[in-house]
Regions:
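Conserved catalytic core of the tyrosine transesterase superfamily
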Residues: 1-202
Length: 202
């Protein structure tokens, strides 16, 4: 389903290329909208241990590993933008950071396009938060522990603070290694009520 969403943006336009990288980043990292629009070019590390640095709730910084497909997509995007480290990673045509409303419109627009080619998409209301849930579900399907998923998504709880004092990038990389790119399909996974409640709290 999410493969259809990633195919929706028109790759012959600047806006379409930006939107695809934005959607892929959100699907893989599970970042909140506020975290995505706060990303700067300098927050992207594409070398060994490729990751994104973001500032989450409570002004706490964390690092999220990048899968190979996301790393290549971001590398290509940055190559055509010729931006400075302090510039927004995802900007308007005038170089200003995208707003929360703009991101929501982008998701709705391409979800509508995807719905025209995917029958299952027509039944769904896709929002930025749904993309965050999708990232969490992919980790769950891959057998990643819920505590690590909460850590990955920057979700604070008594459980996570007791077990982990600092966000461990190596631990997250191991979790990421268990996941598959969006275009690789697998068996359908249905979480139980307890897991659904956990996802709803993220």
């Amino acid at each position: 389903e999410m493969e259809a969403l990633l195919k929706a943006p028109d790759q012959t336009t600047w806006f379409g290329r930006r939107d695809r990288v934005l959607l892929l980043t959100m699907l893989q990292t599970g970042l909140r909208v506020s975290e995505v629009i706060g990303l700067r070019v300098g927050d992207v590390e594409l070398g060994t241990g490729a990751h994104l640095r973001c500032v989450g709730k409570g002004r706490k910084e964390r690092a999220t590993p990048l899968r190979t497909d996301s790393r290549f997509a971001l590398k290509a995007w940055l190559a055509q933008c010729r931006t400075e480290p302090s510039d927004p990673l995802f900007a308007t045509i005038r170089g200003r950071p995208l707003s929360r409303d703009a991101v929501e419109r982008i998701v709705r627009k391409h979800a509508a396009t995807a719905a025209s080619t995917s029958s299952t998409f027509r039944l769904k209301r896709v929002t930025p938060h749904v993309l965050r849930h999708t990232a969490a579900m992919q980790l769950l399907q891959s057998g990643v522990d819920r505590t690590i998923i909460a850590l990955w998504l920057g979700h604070e709880s008594i459980e996570t603070t007791q077990v982990y004092i600092h966000a461990d990038i190596e631990l997250k990389e191991k979790a990421m290694a268990l996941t598959k790119p969006v275009d690789q399909t697998g068996g359908r996974y249905r979480p139980g009520d307890e897991l659904l409640a956990f996802l709803e709290a993220l």
